[in-house]
Amino acid sequence: MIDTDMCHREPVSVRVEELIRAFEDLVAVDHLNFDIPAGRMTGFAGANGAGKTTTMRMIVGVLKPTSGQVLWSGRPITAEDRRTIGYMPEERGLYPKQPVIDQLVYLARIKGASTQTARTEAMEYLDRFGLADHAREQVQKLSLGNQQRIQVTASLLADPAVLILDEPFSGLDPVAVDAMADVLREKTAQGVPVLFSSHQLDLID
């Protein structure tokens, strides 16, 4: 079981308020408003090109809105707040030649975890997702579905205050989807707001 004692922060909520993002003549996001409440899992549905990824990038600070704002528990979000977000981007950013466990430990240490804590937590998630036997393998040697699970695992490490996951279930088999959903439900039970995107409406339901 993942150690829940790490979850020491007061639960936060996130609000997207009148967000607009234009790329020259194309308006990708137009006056968007929604809440990601503390302790809730929010599904973000839409076809490719609907603005899901653009919106997530604005929340985590990768893109600057044309106008509008992101609120963190009722106040404008800061760079320090954003450092506590567990983010899984649309573009998978794993280092293909690095062993899985080394990569996860490195990413967790960037977020402030100690080496021992990072290694313990990473191995617990790998075991839970059926990947413990692959911990020393290079990422590039894993199937795409297993790489997806590693990418999600990276976002879960180091006690994130908020989870923003872009297509986390893409390419996963039903068993892996259930395992991933169970972990996300546990996070929401701890008060963590979770936003995930999907083009599969059955997953949103």
Residue ranges of predicted features:
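Helix-to-loop junction immediately C-terminal to a conserved catalytic motif
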Residues: 60
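Conserved ABC transporter NBD signature motif
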Residues: 68-81
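Conserved ABC ATPase "signature" region
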Residues: 105, 109, 117-134
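Conserved ABC ATPase signature
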Residues: 138-142
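Catalytic Walker B motif of ABC-type/P-loop ATPase nucleotide-binding domains
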Residues: 163-166
